């Protein structure tokens, strides 16, 4: 609460908060999904505009689960059930169709792609083409000549 209120004193824009919904810590010392759903509700009450849901990364623990495209999206979907503000999905969302599926099925409101954009600066244009989005326009005009038509 103190952090959000402090940020609001110096920043008037929308505040996004990243939650790591699990640390994959099998010792039983981490918060539960229900704990994170409650935290998400509190953040919404404080006026947070969006929740960026990820997993792992807080501890040096390798997940003891299968890693596949969209493996973190179930956490986004479960946090989304607890709040009415937008919730993002992340994590190996290399396939534009998978991202679109998560959006269309209500498991997330936004898809975030980090490493995919580092690997391919044309990622958004490629995704738009793959999804047959004929209305997509490149924001930076210098990239237009590189678009596949």
What does each model-found stretch correspond to?
Residues 1-149:
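Flavin-dependent oxidoreductase catalytic cores
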């Amino acid at each position: 609460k103190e952090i959000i209120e402090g940020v609001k004193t110096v920043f008037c824009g929308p505040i996004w908060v990243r939650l790591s919904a699990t640390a994959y810590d099998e010792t039983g010392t981490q918060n539960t999904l229900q704990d994170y759903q409650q935290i998400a509700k509190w953040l919404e009450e404080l006026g947070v505009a969006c929740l960026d849901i990820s997993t792992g990364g807080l501890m040096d623990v390798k997940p003891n689960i299968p890693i596949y495209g969209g493996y973190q999206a179930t956490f986004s979907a479960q946090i989304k059930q607890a709040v009415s503000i937008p919730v993002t999905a992340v994590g190996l969302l290399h396939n534009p169709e998978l991202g679109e599926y998560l959006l269309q099925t209500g498991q997330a409101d936004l898809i975030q792609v980090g490493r995919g954009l580092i690997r391919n600066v044309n990622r958004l244009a490629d995704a738009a083409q793959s999804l047959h989005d004929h209305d997509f326009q490149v924001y930076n005009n210098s990239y237009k000549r590189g678009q596949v038509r």
